Design a protein with these regions (language model features):
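Sec-dependent signal peptide recognition
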Residues: 1-4
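Asp-box/BNR beta-propeller blade signature and adjacent active/binding-site loops
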Residues: 17-381
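Bacterial signal peptide processing site
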Residues: 12-14
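C-terminal motif of bacterial Sec signal peptides marking the signal peptidase cleavage site
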Residues: 8-10
Length: 381
């Protein structure tokens, strides 16, 4: 197996450091680095960040290489990945996970999860655009996996028939003509009878002329080899993220304009309760991410969840909100980027810091930045 050399990709912005002791390897400080900007690697644009920390401590990112413009599918888009083995200070050259070959033959909107056996599962979509999709000319759902910490990837497998359309095992999903995944992080359950289950939030488009989206959870109990679909988790939804709570319930956080949407499942994501809105988190209709920082049932002194999302009714000022009550309320947003900024993804590093992969848009086109945050910079109480 060929190991790719690690390289530092420069466009790091200067960050003031405290003029104290000389650097110590284990000291966690804030730092940031631009990983993709317009024109890099021959691509006009880059979008749609996802990041995860792997069992060996390495970091894996994936994103869209939007070769000719910034538009979504059905444009010609590749999905690429990079790795870091030094907590995000240097990164490998990009590896192509799914290669687009022309309009209606591209791929995009990837999400990641690490399975119990260490495999990395990546789901994404390809083909037609979401709202133009039909069973005869669809946007398709794909899965591929890496068994070597993201260095190589399997050939993408089309799993659309398991999820929606006339062949779907969930008969409700036969009433839908398209589906896509909320890019960023999926979820692996670690508590209760469904421990080991992996899942992603999907937004499905109803048949007919309606562009209304509903959220379902796509889950697997065999590390992503076969898939099932939950009951409807959120009506009138969009891109969404999932989190396991300390009492074993699953929380879904749903993109909305204004107060962000949510719901809960008490049976491992299969059925869902009554949807609601978080008045404590009002934001632009945008994708974000949710991350567990601490859990009392694992020995921590309190429960802490983080949620990244624009702290604005516009796509700007992406921030991290904090919850100390398992997502009932959100507070104390910490600004990640002061200015136009859009999608974001988070992960917890082995050294205890928080890694963020973020779309910053200071000059009219997205740059994809990695930020490393000490936990004490994010928690204010």
């Amino acid at each position: 197996m060929l190991l790719l050399p690690l390289v530092a990709w420069g466009c790091t912005k200067p960050v003031p450091e405290s003029p104290v002791d000389p650097p110590v390897v284990d000291t966690i400080k804030y730092y940031e680095q631009c990983l993709f900007r317009p024109g890099d690697y021959g691509s006009t644009n880059w979008r749609i960040p996802a990041i995860c920390c792997l069992p060996d401590g390495s970091l894996l990112i994936v994103c869209d290489r939007r070769k000719y413009n910034e538009s979504d599918l059905p444009e010609d888009i590749d999905i690429v990945s990079r790795r870091s083995t030094d907590n995000g200070r240097t990164w490998s050259e990009p590896v192509t996970i799914a290669q687009g070959t022309g309009r209606k033959h591209g791929f995009g909107d990837a999400a990641l999860v690490v399975c119990e056996n260490g495999d990395v599962v990546c789901v994404f979509v390809g083909g037609n655009g979401l709202f133009a999709s039909s069973e005869s000319d669809p946007i398709s759902s794909y899965v591929c996996r890496s068994t070597d910490s993201g260095q190589t990837w399997s050939t993408p497998e089309n799993i659309s028939a398991q999820l929606w359309g006339s062949q779907a095992t969930n008969t409700v999903c036969r009433n839908y003509r398209a589906s896509f995944f909320g890019s960023g992080n999926g979820l692996r359950l670690t508590r209760g009878e469904h421990a080991g289950r992996i899942m992603f939030a999907a937004a499905m488009c109803r048949k007919g002329n309606s562009n209304t989206l509903d959220n379902f959870v796509v889950f697997s109990d065999d590390n992503g080899h076969t898939w099932q679909v939950s009951d409807r988790a959120y009506s009138g939804g969009d891109e969404a993220k999932l989190m396991e709570l300390t009492d074993g319930r699953v929380l879904i956080s749903v993109r909305q304009s204004g107060a962000r949407g949510y719901n809960h499942s008490a049976d491992g994501g299969k059925t869902w309760g009554t949807q609601g809105r978080w008045e404590s988190m009002k934001t632009n209709a945008c994708n974000g991410d949710i991350l567990r920082l601490a859990a009392t049932d694992r020995g921590d002194s309190r429960d802490i969840l983080l949620h990244s999302i624009p702290n604005s009714m516009e796509r700007r000022n992406v921030s991290i909100f904090v919850s100390y009550d398992e997502g009932d309320t959100w507070q104390d947003p910490v600004l990640l980027f002061d200015g136009p900024s859009v999608y974001s993804s988070m992960t917890l590093l082995k050294n205890g810091s928080v890694g963020v992969f973020l779309e910053e848009n200071p000059n009219g086109a997205c740059e994809l930045w990695y930020q490393n945050w000490p936990v004490d910079s994010l928690i204010r109480q």
